[in-house]
Each structure stands twice: as structure tokens, then as C-alpha cells.
Amino acid sequence: LILITFLRKEEILKGDSTLVDDVPPHKKSEKTGCLPNMTKTLKSNYIKLLEKTKNLVTLNSAASILHWDMQTKMPPKGIQMRSLQLAMLSRFSHKMITDPEIGRLLKSTLKHPEYDSLDPIQKRNLYLIKKNYNEQTKLPEELVVKITKQQAITIDVWKKAKATKKFLKFKPELEKLFKLKKQAAEILMKVKETATPYDALVDIFEPKMSSEAISKVFKELKDGLTSLIKKCETSPKQPDTSILNHPISTKTQQKIGKLLAEFIGYDVTTINSGGRIDETEHPFTTGYYDDVRITTHYYPNRFASSIFSIMHEGGHAIYEQNLKKEWMFQPVGEACSMGFHESQSRFVENIVGRSREFWSYFFPKLKKMTNRVLSDLTLDNFVYAINHVKPSKIRIEADEVTYSLHIIIRFNLERDLFAEKITIDELPQVWNESYNKHLGVSIENDSKGVMQDTHWASGLYGYFPSYALGNIYSGQLLASMEDDLQDWRTQIAKGDFINVKQWLIKNVHDYGNLHNPKDLIKIISGKELDVKPYLNYLNEKYSRLYEF
């Protein structure tokens, strides 16, 4: 999970890419100030708009740190004050983005006779500022403040309810937040001209993507995954996953995590580091450019959990840290979408982190750091165990084959909630029925069911589809990368992640928010959003592991 800053919660959205051609960003002008021939008025307007955006980003980055503190260091009694602090910051943020002067500056700039002299990056900045302004001016300030305050309260109650396994403790606050988010979604639906309120929320995280389009893509994905799962389950060759239950102390897991971070180039140890790893109930990433923080959760008898959550969140972190420094504080300096964000985290976690090549390098280090606790494990048995395909109850611990089914279930529930086909009161029952139907597992309590994720407590409705879309993007990215780096697996086996990381920087991170996701994936892969490369990757990998 990338914990969205207020900048994204308040919808600095990604817009129509027709303003931008398909020239790679490193071949464009990287200065987004003013062109030499820009008139004084046009230049002045553009600079003022960027200054206002910088102020907004700076304020919202402070809010994101308060969110981080709330889930990592804040004492339990601090929640009431923290909710007031965040509510006040959201009020200031809303006032800043809805400042009438922004409207006047945009109108003057967009109608200026020399507007066409601006380069594509400048036009994209203006487009995104305008889109955000138009949408935010329609949201009442008091509604924005209420949502922010309720989010803080709901997250706090969620933690306590999850610990006691009682949804009834969580339900009242969740209902309050859902009603507020639905109210906002209904307003945004009209502004964005989406088909449904839920589509308006999906658009925040995956611009120009509708629930109807997602449903079609997810059907193809589900059909392919269901077939593969059956092949894995019926294979006579099955791994021994009990080897992953060796007790490893939290202190040792922390050391392992730092070494993993070092491998992917996420610095959490030097005096010039721009990251850190902390412990929370639910892993997340937050921050901006040079201060990007990740969290994980340590289980003494499930050490692999923190390994892969750190790889996952680390993938998010290196995306944020490697966005163009020249674009910092500008709308184009944001990530493309949450789907692309998840493509980076899933790529690092699974395509790299669960590969045999990576573990041929890292496994000896793991055994050494655990003081021979894992001495009875072999590389082959370990790699097989961490890639075991088995339907499970917990999303963040699911294998990469069944994982997307967890997302499809959540997507269906969210869509039905906003369509009023189900209610918050019915969520636990429908959740349990869905898990039994699609994954064949029984949920014994709500902590392992409807309350396992932080997203709904955080008001992040519409985010879940990004995970499965990220998987699909990662498959297309892999296919493209293999054309450029045929020996990437050999490099990983030698402990060298540099060329893979540089490929991701050049082909994903460098583009920032210059394009919509549907256009960016086509620029990178030459194809529209396509499930086949991801399914091909999975089938090739697991047919080798399970020998079918």
C-alpha cells in the first residue's frame, strides 16, 4: 500500500494525455519553468501557479508525516488531537487548491494567445492544476474536513476492533466514513462525468479507468488464474511450507530487512539516507522524494512475511525516490497512477523477490544472518516454499497466483456497496461467502476477514483494483524489459539489481505523471493494457515449479 498524501487524496488527478506527445521525457525539455519567448504575463501566471502548487505539496507532505506518525509512534491517547490536526491541515489544503486566484490565473493562461508556445510538460502541469481545481471547488470545505477527521478516528477504531476480532466495534465509525465518502463520490461523479459514484473514486487512483472496463479485464485475469490454480493444486509435486515457520526474532528480521533494502537501492542506514523502516499493523509507504518511509509487520514464526512486505514497500519507495528531481513540487512530478505504483512494488516483490535467481544470491546471506536456524533448508526447497500456490484468507500473505483473486473480491464488494446492492452491515457475511466461493476458504473471524486491510478504514475506496492492474502492468513491463536486458536474471543472481532498477527508472519513473496510465503502458510496451504477458509469466514460472 502506498499511503496517499493529501495531495492525492484531494485529487491532484492525472488527466487527458492528448496534451503530450509520445517523446520519452529524457528527450524533452526538462526545464518546466518558462520558455525564452514566453511573454511577461504568461510567464508570470505560470510561475504563480507553480508556486501555489509547491505550497500545497509542502503542506500536504507535512500531513503525510502526521499520518505516518499516527500509525507508527503516536501514543494511544493522541488520536483525538491528531484528528483535529489533520482536519485543520485538510481545511488549509482545500482553501489553497480552491483559491479563486488559481481560477483567474488558469483562465488567463489557457486563453493567452501564446499558450501554444508552451512545451508539453508545461501544458500537462496546467491541465492537471485545472482538473484538480475544477473538481475540488465542487467539494464543500466542511465535507473535506469531516472526511479527514473521520478517517483518523476510523483508523484508530479499526486497529482496536481488529485486535479484538469484533466487527461490531468497527462498524459505526466505518458507516460514518462510508457515508461521507459516498457523498463526495456523488459530487465528483458529476464533475468528472463518470458513469457511477464508484467510478469517480476509481479515477482518483487509476485515471480514465472505469469499473466496467476493470470488470472486463478482471474476468480474463480470473479465468486465466483459475485454470493455473487448478493445475498447481492437482500437481503431485507439492512444497513443504512448514520450513517457513522457523522462529526468527524481530531483531534478526530487522537486520534482514535492511539488507534487502540495500539490495534494491533503498537507503535506510547511511547518514545521507532518505528512507526508514518501521513496524505497523499494516505495511505501507509514504513520503515525498528524499523522505520516503516504509513499514512492515514482524511475525516471529512467519519470517517470510516481513521479507516480502519490505520488498513490496521498497518497490513503492524507489519509485517515489527516483521521480525526476527537476519536476519536484509540480503535478508532473507525481507517480503516473496507483496501478503503476503497484506495478513497481509487485515487480520488486514477486518478479525479482520470488525468483530463484535472487535467492541463489541472497539465500546464503539469509542463512548466515539467522545463525544457522535455517541450516536444514536447501535453496530449491526454500524457493519452492515461497512460491507455493494455495488459496488463503489473508491478501498480503497470498501467493502471486491467487493474489489477484483477493483483489477481484474486494473490487466486487466496493462496487456493490456504492451501487447500494449491499450494506456495511452485510459486509462480513458477503465477504465470507465470496471467499468461500472464489477461493474455497472459510473465514473464522472478522480480523482475518473483512477487517484485515486498512484501506476502508482509511477511506481509500477505489484503490484495491490498482493492485491487480499493477500485476498486469508488471507482466507487460517484464516482457518489454526482457527485450532490452536479456541477461537480467543472470545479473540478479550475481547480486546486481542496478541495471534492472535503471531500466525501471528510464521506462517508468522518468515519465512521472506526464501520461495517463493507459497511454504510458502503450508507450512502454507498444500495446494496450493486456493480461496475456502477466499470465504467460505465471504459467511459464509455475509450470517449471510444479512440473506440468
Feature names for model-found ranges:
Residues 49, 189, 312, 345, ...:
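Divalent metal-coordination and catalytic microenvironments
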Residues 40-45, 61-64, 77, 81, ...:
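C-terminal, non-catalytic "cap/extension" segments appended to globular domains
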Residues 305-324, 342-346:
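Active-site recognition of the HExxH zinc-binding catalytic motif
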Residues 334-374:
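Post-HExxH zinc-binding segment in Zn-dependent metallohydrolases
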Residues 34-210, 514, 532, 539-548:
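A well-structured
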Residues 147-303, 542:
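Contiguous, non-catalytic segments that form substrate-binding/exosite surfaces or channel walls
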